[in-house]
Amino acid sequence: SMTSTNLWGDQKAAVAYRIDPSSFLGEHRVPEIPYAIYMILGYDFTGFHVRFRDISRGGVRVILSNDENYVHNRQTQFQENFNLAFTQKLKNKDIPESGSKGTVLMKQGKNDKANLAFSQYVDSIMDICLKAPGVPESDKEEVIFLGPDENTAHLMDGACNYVHDRHYGYWRAFTTGKSNKLGGIPHDTYGMTTRSVRQFVEGTQRKLNLKEKECTKLITGGPDGDLGSNEILLSKEKIVGVVDGSG
């Protein structure tokens, strides 16, 4: 069932629905029922946001399609979003925040509107969090945090500043991946994600009595992103190949 919406607001940038997941996921085979699901419908995009606890964090990615894969992306968007959020929940097991994930699927031929779509995605979610005019009143506080992902890393500062302008109480923490001047920590500079992954690799090597310098490996993902580039810098294995779709 729908628990909140900005449908009746007269200044909405997109229509957002907050949905009780137990009302429709209970009969399906999912590993766990999320805490909340948002569905956001914009002129040029369809968006979702799934979180597994009231306080959760995870990235939001913009999905850009070509003529060949748009239908597939549209049909699998929610399932992919759910899987990403559940995976983020597992990743966040050792920190106070649970996991969440968001996706913004651009409609066919509308990839050039991606930045605007992300802004509208944030704006419509804020309508519900801030109980904008036309949004049903609720005694329960709604808290949303976002992070960078595919095609959104450059938008974190703007999102942080925007929710500040809308007087969101948690604006400083609203996005990760923002610039230092807004309180962000450059995780790529410190290799934060890579160092976490390396613990699994090194733990496996210890368990199997393998010496790091004697191991060979093939990297998929490549040096273009912060994870692959820092993996190359931090590791001592012999790299025999790198596959990077971005070139």
Where are these regions (language model features)?
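Glycine-rich phosphate/diphosphate-binding loop of Rossmann-like nucleotide-binding domains
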Residues: S179-G247
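N-terminal ligand-binding/catalytic initiation module
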Residues: S1-H187
